[in-house]
Amino acid sequence: MRGIARRLSSGLPLPVLLLAAFAAWILTATPPTGFPILEYHMVTEPPRPGAEPYVVPPEEFAAQLDYLAAEGYTTITPQDYARARKGKQELPEKPVILSFDDGYEDNYRVILPMLKERGMKAVFYVVTNDIGLPGYMTWDNLFDMERSGMEIGSHTANHIPLTTLPPEKQREELHLSKLMLEWKGLKTIYSFSYPTGAYDDGIVAMLAEEDYLTAVTGEAGLNNVETNPYLLHRVNIPRPHFGLTEFRMRLMKADIAARLHVRLAQLPDGVREGITHLRTLLHGNQ
């Protein structure tokens, strides 16, 4: 008690002290093992009006790729991860997945050449009813991407948050998007990205029933073979304001979130559920 009194007498407000103690509690958790999945949307200049937060300038993206390479990261795809979970493939020492949502045309025009130049690969989650529309990739673009070693995944047929739909419509979005991509001649679609990151237990079960093997969320953290393959963590990479410093902080966010997962698992059920609910509310307001 005397120690607490001394800290309180230092002039720091109690909420600040509590927040500092909570942060220390998280950061002293056993360091998690796992790899990050990075979430991108567009890489182009100038950005679409109203889409600025989702657009990374090409020179910034190039610097991020070069940073990952310099730090020893090796790019893999969700299918590589799925094979590793089944013991059919070994992952590199320091893997990372680069993921791109929505299927914008710059994914082919700008991103693909930059990845090929560096011998990197990625997964591109496309909305099937947007393919070929102005501003989006064409079927020929997708075939060329696949030939270049990229993985194509589903982002549903219409990009509607699945939790807003009745179960039969949810299944249509999962089934028809996968069916269309495969019917057009792409390889079997195994990976999925939840529109706006929205999911529930029923949707997760449907993905398995529809023969998907992995799905990515919008929740930060690290991933390993013990992670639920339908609840893979991702770190959003928005338009940066502080260059590589901000990018490094985003990677650190995945580590901190993973440590939080470790600590939450150590709490009583009621406390853990309360904190998880609060995190969900905060995530929805970002």
Model features per residue range: what roles?
Residues 2-4, 11-15, 19-99, 105-106, ...:
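C-terminal active-site subregion of NodB/CE4 polysaccharide deacetylases
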Residues 96, 108-113, 122:
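Acidic, polar ligand-binding/catalytic clefts
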Residues 104-105, 158:
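Short, glycine/acidic-enriched loop or turn micro-motifs at the edges of active sites
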Residues 135-142, 169-173:
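Charged helix-capping and loop-helix junction motifs
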